[in-house]
Amino acid sequence: METPPQTTRARLRGELLDDADIYHHVSELMQPLLLCYDSLVACNMYDIANDELSNIIRRVACFGLELLKLDIRQESGRHADVLAAITDYLKLGNYHDWDESQRQTFLLNELNNPRPLLPRQLYATADAPINAEPVKEVLATFNMLAQQPAGALGAYVISMAKQPSDVLAVMLLQKEAEVPHPMRVVPLFETLADLDNAPACLDALLSIAWFDILP
């Protein structure tokens, strides 16, 4: 169940791997284990079947391939910076200058829109906000999330969350990156003012009809 050293080194170098012998889903590992167990039981070899093999099956059932789920954490302002760069590129204005109502309207419209927010090929100067390294870093994080298998990811934690738009922003960026198994979004209210406003913020989020269609 350990990753071969050569596989780890290749991944660190960013090399493409022949993944034919790599498990991608827990069922791929569980199936042969259960087959072994059933075969041992059929041969009346109960002591062997119910010893170490049973322990391995329980561990796989509990922890999967990943052993634990990975949480992602990012500050709300970084998401706002990305959306400001996007709205600048699309010539829609400056997201930073919009009030909460304008932000929610924009975010919900895009969440409900089947088309991508950005074209796949960007035509922008090197010094354009959309090409800023902090913006590209956040977008790269979401693109990385889209490549992860189901069950590998836990929660996307937003530090310094303040308003409903902070949560909607992360949902939109997941949609834009085509994350196949969107992470649940957890706003973290940290200042006293934000903590006082947290109940109203959550009530506002839950009152949005778009949330009714979420699984």
Stretches found by the model and what they are:
Residues 1-147:
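Extended, charge-enriched "interface" segments that sit outside catalytic cores
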Residues 38, 57-60, 69-71, 114-215:
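Conserved alpha/beta-domain cores
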